[in-house]
Amino acid sequence: MRGMDEMQETLFTTVKLEDFVPADHPLRPIRLLVNQALKRLNGLFSVIYADSGRASIAPEKLVRALLLQVFYSVRSERMLMEQMQYNLLFRWFVGLAIEDTVWNHSVFSKNRDRLLEHEVVESFFTEVMRLADKQGLLSREHFSVDGTLIQAWASHKSFRRKDGSDDPPPGSGRNAEADWKGERRSNETHESSTDADSRLYKKSKQSPAILCYQGHILMENRSGLVVGAVVSHADGFAERASALRLLDCVPGTHAKTVGADKAYDTHDFVNDCRARNVTPHVARNDARPGGSAIDDRTSRHAGYQMSQIIRKRIEEHFGWGKTVGRIRQTVYRGIKRVDQHFKLTMVASNLTRMARIMDEVLTGAVQ
């Protein structure tokens, strides 16, 4: 018998959002981890928000929504609010009931900036790492470090002289053609009128110069989790300076090792690491003038070879962040907002990896 093409809605329903989410959905273990970390931030949230006045967006729901934006590559807050209107999975993860009203996108953005002001993402990052440490997933001795370029939300046409002496572009219109042939353009004399914190930089002679930031992460070598992340202005010294800054945040004065690529093979970086009781397992750059700063006393050991193998796993976080987390080109302006988004992306990458590792452990225990 042919069914009728009609829809008859009931006035009441007894189905819960929980019933729509499959029991084996990958967001289920991630949501449990997120909720455990957010519970420990209750004291911070109590300080941030006043006891009286109009209720804001719950910070816990705000953080969950921002994580969804990373997990599902949602390109804007406007699009995120639109999807939360009809996506039951999004509503379940954030904690909105079916009949709850979705927030206005501009209100959501203003509340997001409050998290930036009080460094909530940094605190959330710390709590997620504390959960990983309790599960025995973190190494306290062996680390890897690397950096990547994050293209700024600004064009070359916005890169103008600081003194305002640029000639007006020929032609008319908002996006007139520009010709910089023969003109010397540097960060000392020019800056972007769109994003003044971005810098014109290229990572190699073969690549073009772009307006960008540099993102840096410190990864522990046991489970491949990011234990430190920071965004800096892009220049030739930022990678090594940020690596030392991240190493200084590792607790304890015990001996450690850090793996890195050839860009870190400088005498200053190697000496600074050793002064911190950190053995630099840096890839040797014998083609550098003056030779490599790493000699055979370091590179002959099996631990050095192991660090060189494991350090390449750091690219998995950058790859995930650029294809899923939208850090290939940021949509935010200003180094503080870019730094917040970069840290949130690395937290999301950690959560997916932690959920997968813990699932494998449970599966192995059952077998």
Model-predicted regions and their roles:
Residues S52-E60, P208, R333-F342:
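Structural motif
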